[in-house]
Design a protein with these regions (language model features):
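Conserved amphipathic alpha-helix within the SDR
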Residues: 44-58
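A short, exposed helix-loop element centered on a Lys and neighboring polar residues
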Residues: 97-98
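Canonical Rossmann dinucleotide-binding motif of NAD(H)/NADP(H)-dependent dehydrogenases/reductases
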Residues: 3-36
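Active-site loop of short-chain dehydrogenase/reductase
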Residues: 9, 57-58, 105-110
Length: 110
C-alpha cells in the first residue's frame, strides 16, 4: 500500500470505532485516502445499503466488523448470544458487498 495509489480514494470503513477500526482509519488517511468512517451497528437488514448510499462513491470497502470480547465460556453460550454475534459479525458482510458492488462494477474499479 502506497500513498500514490490511495491518494484521493474514498475508503468506507465499518465499525470504525472498534477493534482495528481506529488504526485502519489512521493508516488510510496517512496514505492520502478520503476515509468515510462509520460506527453504526449495521444490524438492520437495510442498514448496509443505506450506509453505502449515504457514502456515495466508494473505491475501497473495508468490512471491519467487531464487538467486545465475549466473557461467556464457550460451553455456556446461549443460542440468543450466538445469534447476536452472528448478526453483528457475519450478516452485514454480504449485505455490504451487495450494496457496493454495482457501483464498482459500473466504474470497473473498486
Amino acid at each position: 500500500m502506497t500513498s500514490q495509489n490511495l491518494a484521493g480514494k474514498r475508503v468506507l470503513i465499518t465499525h470504525a470505532d472498534a477493534f482495528m477500526g481506529p488504526t485502519l482509519c489512521a493508516v488510510f488517511a496517512e496514505h492520502g485516502a478520503i476515509v468515510i468512517a462509520d460506527s453504526s451497528p449495521l444490524l438492520a437488514p437495510e442498514a448496509p445499503a443505506a450506509l453505502v448510499e449515504s457514502a456515495g462513491i466508494v473505491d475501497i470497502l473495508v468490512v471491519n466488523l467487531a464487538l467486545p470480547a465475549p466473557s461467556t465460556p464457550a460451553a455456556e453460550v446461549s443460542d440468543a448470544e450466538w445469534s447476536q454475534v452472528f448478526a453483528t459479525l457475519v450478516d452485514p458482510l454480504p449485505r455490504l458487498v451487495r450494496a457496493v458492488l454495482p457501483q464498482m462494477i459500473e466504474r470497473r474499479s473498486g
